[in-house]
Protein backbone atom coordinates (compact mmCIF):
# COMPACT_ATOMS: atom_id res chain seq x y z
CA UNK A 1 0.00 0.00 0.00
CA UNK A 2 1.25 3.46 -0.86
CA UNK A 3 2.04 5.62 2.17
CA UNK A 4 0.75 9.10 2.86
CA UNK A 5 4.28 10.46 2.46
CA UNK A 6 4.62 8.86 -1.01
CA UNK A 7 1.20 10.12 -2.17
CA UNK A 8 1.95 13.66 -1.01
CA UNK A 9 5.36 13.77 -2.69
CA UNK A 10 4.03 12.14 -5.89
CA UNK A 11 1.45 14.95 -6.09
CA UNK A 12 4.25 17.52 -5.94
CA UNK A 13 3.44 18.74 -2.44
CA UNK A 14 5.85 19.16 0.44
CA UNK A 15 5.38 16.32 2.92
CA UNK A 16 4.54 17.98 6.25
CA UNK A 17 3.47 16.37 9.52
CA UNK A 18 -0.09 17.81 9.31
CA UNK A 19 -0.55 16.60 5.72
CA UNK A 20 0.74 13.13 6.60
CA UNK A 21 -1.46 12.94 9.71
CA UNK A 22 -4.64 13.93 7.84
CA UNK A 23 -3.91 11.65 4.90
CA UNK A 24 -2.96 8.70 7.14
CA UNK A 25 -6.29 9.10 8.93
CA UNK A 26 -8.25 9.19 5.65
CA UNK A 27 -6.36 6.18 4.27
CA UNK A 28 -7.48 4.10 7.25
CA UNK A 29 -10.87 5.72 7.93
CA UNK A 30 -12.48 7.01 4.73
CA UNK A 31 -15.57 9.22 4.62
CA UNK A 32 -14.71 11.34 7.66
CA UNK A 33 -15.93 14.90 8.12
CA UNK A 34 -13.58 17.73 9.09
CA UNK A 35 -14.92 17.77 12.69
CA UNK A 36 -14.37 13.99 12.92
CA UNK A 37 -10.83 14.45 11.64
CA UNK A 38 -10.22 17.30 14.09
CA UNK A 39 -11.28 15.18 17.06
CA UNK A 40 -9.10 12.25 15.94
CA UNK A 41 -5.95 14.26 15.18
CA UNK A 42 -3.50 15.83 17.64
CA UNK A 43 -4.73 19.13 19.09
CA UNK A 44 -1.65 20.85 17.65
CA UNK A 45 -3.42 21.16 14.28
CA UNK A 46 -5.85 24.11 14.34
CA UNK A 47 -9.23 23.93 12.63
CA UNK A 48 -8.03 26.43 10.02
CA UNK A 49 -4.87 24.38 9.53
CA UNK A 50 -6.98 21.26 9.02
CA UNK A 51 -9.13 22.96 6.37
CA UNK A 52 -5.98 24.27 4.66
CA UNK A 53 -4.51 20.75 4.56
CA UNK A 54 -7.77 19.28 3.23
CA UNK A 55 -7.91 21.96 0.54
CA UNK A 56 -4.27 21.33 -0.43
CA UNK A 57 -4.86 17.57 -0.67
CA UNK A 58 -8.09 18.08 -2.62
CA UNK A 59 -6.53 20.48 -5.11
CA UNK A 60 -3.60 18.06 -5.58
CA UNK A 61 -6.07 15.29 -6.44
CA UNK A 62 -5.17 13.08 -3.47
CA UNK A 63 -8.48 13.58 -1.65
CA UNK A 64 -11.99 14.28 -2.84
CA UNK A 65 -14.99 15.55 -0.94
CA UNK A 66 -18.64 14.68 -1.30
CA UNK A 67 -21.78 15.77 0.54
CA UNK A 68 -24.58 13.28 1.05
CA UNK A 69 -27.93 15.05 1.49
CA UNK A 70 -28.23 16.48 4.99
CA UNK A 71 -24.53 16.05 5.76
CA UNK A 72 -21.49 18.27 5.77
CA UNK A 73 -18.61 17.46 3.43
CA UNK A 74 -16.94 14.09 3.86
CA UNK A 75 -13.47 13.29 2.60
CA UNK A 76 -11.98 10.19 1.01
CA UNK A 77 -8.82 9.09 -0.76
CA UNK A 78 -10.55 7.04 -3.43
CA UNK A 79 -10.08 9.38 -6.38
CA UNK A 80 -9.74 8.99 -10.12
CA UNK A 81 -12.69 6.69 -10.61
CA UNK A 82 -16.42 7.21 -10.86
CA UNK A 83 -17.71 5.41 -7.79
CA UNK A 84 -20.78 6.12 -5.72
CA UNK A 85 -21.92 5.67 -2.12
CA UNK A 86 -24.43 3.69 -0.08
CA UNK A 87 -25.50 5.51 3.10
CA UNK A 88 -27.29 3.83 6.01
CA UNK A 89 -30.28 5.91 7.12
CA UNK A 90 -29.97 4.57 10.67
CA UNK A 91 -26.28 4.68 11.64
CA UNK A 92 -24.82 6.82 8.82
CA UNK A 93 -22.33 4.17 7.66
CA UNK A 94 -21.04 4.93 4.16
CA UNK A 95 -19.88 2.26 1.73
CA UNK A 96 -18.23 2.79 -1.66
CA UNK A 97 -20.02 1.25 -4.65
CA UNK A 98 -18.40 0.86 -8.05
CA UNK A 99 -20.18 2.31 -11.05
CA UNK A 100 -21.51 -0.02 -13.72
CA UNK A 101 -18.91 -2.02 -15.62
CA UNK A 102 -18.23 -0.83 -19.16
CA UNK A 103 -19.69 2.46 -20.30
CA UNK A 104 -21.35 3.75 -17.15
CA UNK A 105 -24.94 4.63 -17.98
CA UNK A 106 -24.81 7.20 -15.22
CA UNK A 107 -22.46 9.28 -17.39
CA UNK A 108 -24.93 9.51 -20.24
CA UNK A 109 -27.64 12.02 -19.29
CA UNK A 110 -30.88 11.99 -21.24
CA UNK A 111 -30.35 15.68 -22.03
CA UNK A 112 -26.85 17.17 -21.77
CA UNK A 113 -28.26 20.74 -21.83
CA UNK A 114 -25.38 21.78 -24.07
CA UNK A 115 -22.69 20.63 -21.65
CA UNK A 116 -19.61 18.94 -23.08
CA UNK A 117 -16.97 16.66 -21.56
CA UNK A 118 -19.30 15.24 -18.90
CA UNK A 119 -16.93 13.12 -16.83
CA UNK A 120 -18.49 12.50 -13.44
CA UNK A 121 -21.83 11.71 -11.85
CA UNK A 122 -22.65 11.65 -8.14
CA UNK A 123 -25.10 9.01 -7.04
CA UNK A 124 -26.00 8.28 -3.43
CA UNK A 125 -28.15 5.32 -2.52
CA UNK A 126 -29.88 5.36 0.86
CA UNK A 127 -30.95 2.29 2.81
CA UNK A 128 -30.22 0.25 5.92
CA UNK A 129 -26.87 -1.49 6.42
CA UNK A 130 -26.68 -5.15 7.43
CA UNK A 131 -25.70 -4.34 11.02
CA UNK A 132 -28.74 -2.10 11.53
CA UNK A 133 -31.01 -4.57 9.71
CA UNK A 134 -29.88 -7.40 12.01
CA UNK A 135 -30.27 -5.15 15.05
CA UNK A 136 -33.83 -4.28 14.01
CA UNK A 137 -34.68 -7.97 13.54
CA UNK A 138 -33.50 -8.66 17.08
CA UNK A 139 -35.79 -5.94 18.47
CA UNK A 140 -38.94 -7.44 16.96
Language-model features: locations:
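Short alpha-helical segments that sit at the start of domains
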Residues: 1-23
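Short, locally clustered residues in the helix-turn-helix/winged-helix DNA-binding domain
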Residues: 24-28
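Short acidic, hydrophobic short linear motifs in intrinsically disordered regions
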Residues: 32-41
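Basic amphipathic alpha-helical segments that dock to polyanions
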Residues: 50-62
